Amino acid sequence: RLFNPRRYNPDEWAELARAAGIKYVVFTAKHHAGFCMWDTRTTPFNVINTAYGKDLTRPLAEAFRRQGIAVGLYFSPDDFWWLNQHGKPINRAPFPGVTPQELPELMAYDKAQIRELLTGFGKIDLFFIDGPAEGLRELCWEIDPDIVVTRGAIETPEQFIPGLPLSGAWEANLTMGTEWPYK
């Protein structure tokens, strides 16, 4: 199917979020498939090269910021598109040989994308790294020492709430259904 979110309206979303008392939003800038929801210079596999042809990340960040809501971005360092383009198996850790920590070229690619996201979209309050964060979280803190980084300073148990308090800051990472994708 053709990706063309013609009814995308981040201003409406932000107004509803403010009315609901939401304090922060986390937008998926890049998931495991590697598709980038912003106008990146790092890859042609991005929203600009779709029928929609416009950045989705910038208007969302601006809309939520106007409503006084903190802006977070979700970023997967696992990038199936990149792995495929470089003849690597499409998989995630703990599968060996597919993480940025094992592939210097993928680490450089991820870092370039993180630099774009943390320097080109105004203040980003939270950066959610969904995967091995070593080398990436440090870059986030180098760019903005005050940014909150998951898998860096906050643990994010997935699809459950721990029975006992965790030792540090944490946030339960739950879906509204039984799966991560929309159904």
Q: Model-predicted segments: where are they?
A:
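Mature catalytic domains of secreted/periplasmic carbohydrate-active enzymes
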Residues: 1-183
